[in-house]
A protein has these predicted regions:
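Short strand-turn segments of transmembrane beta-barrel domains in outer membranes
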Residues: 128-166, 189-191
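Short acidic/polar hinge/loop motifs at secondary-structure boundaries
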Residues: 64, 93-120, 136
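Transmembrane beta-strands of outer-membrane beta-barrel pores
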Residues: 120, 147-151, 183-187, 209, ...
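Extracytoplasmic beta-strand/coil segments of soluble accessory domains associated
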Residues: 23-26, 53-94
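Transmembrane beta-barrel wall of Gram-negative outer-membrane proteins
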Residues: 154-185, 190-228, 239, 249-270
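Outer-membrane beta-barrel "beta-signal"
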Residues: 595-610
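Short loop/turn motifs that connect adjacent beta-strands in outer-membrane beta-barrel proteins
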Residues: 136-141, 166-175, 208-211, 264-272, ...
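Flexible loop and strand-edge segments within Gram-negative outer membrane beta-barrel domains
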Residues: 213-293, 326-332, 383-387, 398-401
Length: 610
């Protein structure tokens, strides 16, 4: 614990304001100014999606284990790796579950986010996902309203208000405040899948002077969600909602999470301190945890070199519950140095990482080369990282096995060709996991910690036909073929051998710009696979047991119509339109959890400058 305390003390010392420092102009202006593309129809559509995994599905080599419903533990996998290796960040806060370690996409304030960025170099990450809040122009008071209604009694509302004052209590500088609230409820497609409560509260305030700024943020989440263990029966009977039954219909998962963040920004460094608390319970079994962490970042520029130095540390303790021993602790310290060397035609990025997790030190690194040669943009990336530590217990629902300290090495590359509105990018990847921790289902609702050694590989292509800024035809396609070498666990095909996703649409502007239309069809398809099973007590996606029914090859189509009326956006989404028809009885991506059939949603997104 002494190295961790020393690291936190260093953060506190570095957090002292530096006299006469000057914040770059871009930093000052970027705090609360809406980017144009974020206030467009595409930005509004991000608010309409269940979570950010729909956006992540466009990343080369990625696949989404989807449930098609709000608040369910949808998981994103890339390069054939376990979904648990992804490290999600909300600003500088690690946003994986404090207890189970899975990324909590469902707890993000989705309607208020910028588009996520993939960064394998984030602390603690094999694959990192960085998310940030959208910002609002507060020179005038600003309000956003977002309402959704849909099938199975869906009701969802999000409201945001932000404003600014140049003086408060006689103090110089700018005070900027933001308040947002979100609530949702839905009956669910099957018994035992009801979202009984979803509440979210976001508060952010910022005090800014010319030389420095201090920001405080608070995010609160509550969830109470049905947690059945799968639809019973075999064949087409499982897709008949009138007669289908589920296992564990009355069971629920309950969660409360609070995140507090303080960030000091100067010209020389950015220092953040955060406190996260969380409780998670399933049928009386659960625990509560508290995590205290800090981050310090500094950028340098030496000639063509752009250096970025970052230090992260946290300590965590189980404060109550029966799923894990009270007082059980975990800690992490990580130091990174990143150098980006600029060339006339591209750049070379090198990153070195040293990480201590629960007392064990492990090195890591990343190397990326990217170039622009006329209309050709090749890239190549290599990375090596320690595998994340597994959950060590969850009462009777998890058996602690022998999990060794593992590592994961990845290589990917591709070539982008851009010709006017058309672009094409063939790509390939290979990943090798050595003794990577995972979870294997023994029987339904009971899993064991295991470690696996395997190699995955694949190749794919991305096509894009861009529309004009506000009108015309557009199309996107992301298709890949994958394979897995011999595995120590002989787990079978957890990832489809081929899968694709795409969108075809048309934009139009009518009545001299007062009405903007965007109509499209979204689709995805996948091959037969064993897939990953849902462990209902924790929400983890695990290697399934023989009791699970394999997933058949199938597809899903969605119809999306958006209309921009002055500043407001109205949209209708009709999801999985062929399921439950003569074309197909049903489909699923996670064994025994069919995707909702012919599910519609209606929404209104309305930013107001008041």
């Amino acid at each position: 614990m002494y190295p961790l305390r020393a690291a936190l003390l260093c953060v506190a010392v570095l957090s002292v304001p530096i006299a006469r420092a000057q914040i770059p102009v871009d930093t000052v202006r970027s705090f609360m100014s809406f980017r144009v593309e974020e206030d467009s129809l595409e930005g509004a559509l991000l608010s309409a999606d269940h979570d950010i995994t729909y956006v992540l599905s466009g990343v080369p080599g990625s696949f989404v284990y989807d449930f098609g419903a709000f608040a369910w533990p949808t998981a994103w996998s890339v390069n054939g790796l376990s979904p648990q290796v992804a490290q999600l960040y909300f600003g500088p806060i690690p946003f994986n579950d404090l207890l189970t370690g899975r990324p909590r996409y469902d707890l993000l304030p989705t309607a208020l986010l910028r588009y996520p960025k993939i960064d394998p170099g984030l602390p603690g990450a094999v694959v990192g996902i960085q998310t940030e809040l959208r910002t609002a122009d507060t020179r005038k008071p600003h309000t956003q309203l977002h309402y959704q209604a849909g099938a199975h009694g869906l009701q969802r509302v999000t409201a945001l208000h932000a404003q600014q004052t140049n003086r408060l209590f006689g103090l110089p500088g700018k005070f900027q405040g933001l308040f947002a609230y979100s609530g949702a409820a839905v009956a669910g497609d099957y018994p035992g899948s009801r979202l009984r409560r979803q509440r979210q509260l976001l508060l952010r305030t910022r005090y800014q002077q010319y030389t420095w700024s201090l920001e405080l943020l608070y995010l609160h989440n509550q969830r109470r969600l049905g947690a059945h263990s799968g639809v019973l029966g075999a064949g087409e009977a499982r897709y008949n909602r009138l007669i289908a039954q589920v296992s564990g219909e009355s069971r629920t998962r309950r969660l409360v999470r609070n995140d507090f963040l303080s960030t000091l920004t100067t010209r020389f460094l950015i220092a953040s301190v955060y406190l996260s608390t969380q409780s998670l319970y399933y049928e009386g079994v659960g625990a509560a945890a508290r995590r205290l962490g800090a981050t310090v970042q500094r950028n340098f520029r030496i000639g063509r070199h752009r250096l970025h130095v970052r230090g992260d540390a946290y300590t965590q303790r189980i404060s109550s519950g029966v799923a894990l021993p009270i007082g059980h602790s975990a800690s992490s310290i990580e130091v990174q140095v990143r150098d980006s060397l600029q060339f006339k035609t591209g750049y070379l990025l090198a990153q070195g990482i040293m990480r201590q997790q629960n007392g064990d030190w492990a090195p890591g690194g990343r190397l990326r080369w990217e170039s622009t040669l006329s209309s050709i943009r090749p890239y190549l990336e290599l990375s090596h990282s320690a595998a994340p530590s597994p959950l060590t217990g969850w009462g009777e629902y998890l058996v602690d096995g022998m999990a060794e300290s593992g590592s994961i090495t990845q290589a990917s590359g591709g070539v982008g060709l851009h010709m006017g509105r058309f672009s094409v990018q063939p790509y390939g990847f290979v990943a090798n996991a050595q003794n990577a921790p995972d979870y294997r289902e023994i029987i339904i609702d009971s899993v064991q910690v295991v470690s696996d050694t395997y190699t995955t590989f694949g190749a794919g292509i991305r096509l894009n036909i861009a529309s004009e800024p506000e009108r015309g035809l557009y199309a996107t396609l992301n298709s890949a073929m994958t394979g897995t070498g011999e595995t120590k666990l002989d787990a079978g095909c957890l990832f489809p051998e081929w899968f694709s996703s795409g969108r075809l649409g048309f934009k139009a502007v009518l009545f001299t710009g007062d009405l903007r239309l965007n109509a499209s069809v979204r689709g995805r398809s996948w091959s037969a696979m064993i897939s990953r099973a849902l462990h209902a007590p924790t929400g983890l996606l695990v290697i399934p047991s023989a009791e699970r029914t394999p997933v058949d090859a199938s597809y899903a189509l969605d119809l999306v119509v958006e209309g921009g009326i002055r500043t407001a956006t109205v949209y209708i989404i009709y999801e999985n339109i062929t399921s439950g028809t003569r074309l197909m009885s049903g489909n699923e991506l996670v064994p025994d959890y069919p995707l909702p059939a012919q599910q519609w949603r209606f929404g209104v997104y309305w930013p107001i400058a008041n």
